[in-house]
Swiss-Prot record:
This is Uncharacterized protein ycf40. Gene3D superfamilies: 3.10.20.30. It holds the Pfam family ThiS. It comes from Porphyra purpurea (Red seaweed). The keyword Plastid applies. Keywords: Chloroplast, Plastid. CDD domains: Ubl_ThiS (cd00565). It comes from the Eukaryota. The gene is ycf40. InterPro entries: Beta-grasp_dom_sf (IPR012675), Mopterin_synth/thiamin_S_b (IPR016155), Thi_S (IPR010035), ThiS/MoaD-like (IPR003749). Belongs to the ycf40 family. Coiled coil: none annotated. It is found in: Plastid, Chloroplast. One of its GO terms (cellular component) is chloroplast.
Length: 71
């Protein structure tokens, strides 16, 4: 079996993994609360309902935007 490393960028920082990851798995791994974020993959805003079924591919650029309430 060939093990292909996947290289992506998360908020402009390099991130490597040894297998494809679902976006939801990545968010859990990075300890993000998926209810308070917006995600762009390659400049496309992704609806929360697709987090479980979307997989990160080699060379993807992921932007995780944290939504902060205030007053």
């Amino acid at each position: 079996m060939i093990n292909k490393n996947i290289s992506i960028q998360i908020n402009g920082e390099p991130f490597n993994c040894s297998e494809p990851l679902s976006l939801q798995f990545l968010l859990n791994y990075l300890d993000f609360n998926s209810e308070r974020i917006a995600i762009e993959i390659n400049s496309t805003l992704l609806p929360e309902r697709l987090f479980h079924s979307t997989y990160i591919n080699d060379q993807d650029k992921v932007e995780i935007i944290t939504i902060v309430g205030g007053g």
